[in-house]
Amino acid sequence: PEGLEVVFGRLRTTIIGIRYGAPFNLPLKVDNELELISRRLSTKQAKYITFEVMMPTSFNGTFGDITFPTSSLIFSSLVDKWNAGDMTDVLDKDLIRTVADKVRLERWEGHTKRVFYGRDRGLTGFVGKFTFNISKLAEEENQLLTVLALFGQHCGIGRLSSQGLGQVRVTLQNK
């Protein structure tokens, strides 16, 4: 929506154009899902997944927002977004959560950050780099989580991702 005024805290700006790129230069069409999966399955199994959270995000918790990522929170969020989309197959969230619970956080560097999206409304979220060790997973589990992680570059993670929060860059490492 060109000409729309956007306010983040004290920053006030006007949208003059929108550019969008799909992960891995995939074409923006229905075949993205199958292309993403086939590209991932044809490569070597990853040992680490790094999520670089570029825009603050948090997760819904029972007693308020959760401002630190766990593998279970990240992948549950991604499954919800996958299943909400126009995907041909719905993924089992409980199964994904069980697989994600086997993954451990190897290293992290991040901090909380407050973002205001209205005069008196804001979100305290987190930003930073979070590397998860997935080397102990079975091949099928590894492939499932890496496809979901790469999908996260398209949809974001956590709360308010449709408003631009929770944008991530994902890096897969074999060493």
Segments and roles (model prediction):
Residues 1-175:
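RNA-interacting cores
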